[in-house]
Amino acid sequence: AGAAEDLSKEQVQMLRKAFDMFDRDKKGVIHTNMVSTILRTLGQTFEEKDLKDLIAEIDQDGSGELEFEEFMALAARFLVEEDAEAMQEELREAFRLYDKQGQGFINVSDLRDILRALDDKLTEDELDEMIAEIDTDGSGTVDFDEFMEMMTG
């Protein structure tokens, strides 16, 4: 799961706005029972139980109140996770485009095209190195798991 430092500037600003909205007394804290409302407002879906466990973990003194930093750390777990899922979906799409026969693998020349499309500054040597690292068995093909491992590793 994510950490607060993985949040984008926009996400931090969005969380700050939401936090301030629920910090009615401007004490710099929100009540832990507000957290699920805020997360839902931000379009997050989650299991209540997971949220309760997280709150217990973050609100260590059991005060029932969270400061902005604590709230951010908690929200990051949900927001960053969603980004990771979205990224995985995009990578799956990229993989599918090249796996035209739906065999579950692509050949290394297709992989080279994908890598070049993602980063046009890569040299041929760097591409060769990356491919050698992924295609560890030298089969000339890369399956989706190997591909994901390389892209997210």
Swiss-Prot record:
Modified residues (Blocked amino end (Ala)): 1
Binding-site positions, Ca(2+) 2: 99, 110
SUPFAM superfamilies the UniProt entry points to: EF-hand (SSF47473)
One Pfam family cited in the UniProt record for this chain: EF-hand_7
Cellular-component GO terms for this entry: myosin II complex
PROSITE patterns: EF_HAND_1, EF_HAND_2
Binding site for Ca(2+) 3: 135, 137, 139, 141, 146
Domain (EF-hand): residue spans on this chain: 10-45, 46-81, 86-121, 122-153
Gene3D superfamilies from the UniProt entry: EF-hand
Domain of life of the native organism: Eukaryota
Annotated residues for binding of Ca(2+) 1: 59, 61, 63, 65, 70
InterPro entries the record matches: CALM/Myosin/TropC-like (IPR050230), EF-hand-dom_pair (IPR011992), EF_Hand_1_Ca_BS (IPR018247), EF_hand_dom (IPR002048)
GO molecular function: calcium ion binding
Classification via CDD domains: EFh
Similarity remark: Belongs to the troponin C family.
Cited PANTHER family: CALMODULIN LIKE 3, MYOSIN LIGHT CHAIN 1, 3
Function of the protein: Troponin is the central regulatory protein of striated muscle contraction. Tn consists of three components: Tn-I which is the inhibitor of actomyosin ATPase, Tn-T which contains the binding site for tropomyosin and Tn-C. The binding of calcium to Tn-C abolishes the inhibitory action of Tn on actin filaments.
Name of the protein this chain belongs to: Troponin C
Origin species: Tachypleus tridentatus (Japanese horseshoe crab)
Lineage start: Eukaryota, Metazoa, Ecdysozoa, Arthropoda, Chelicerata
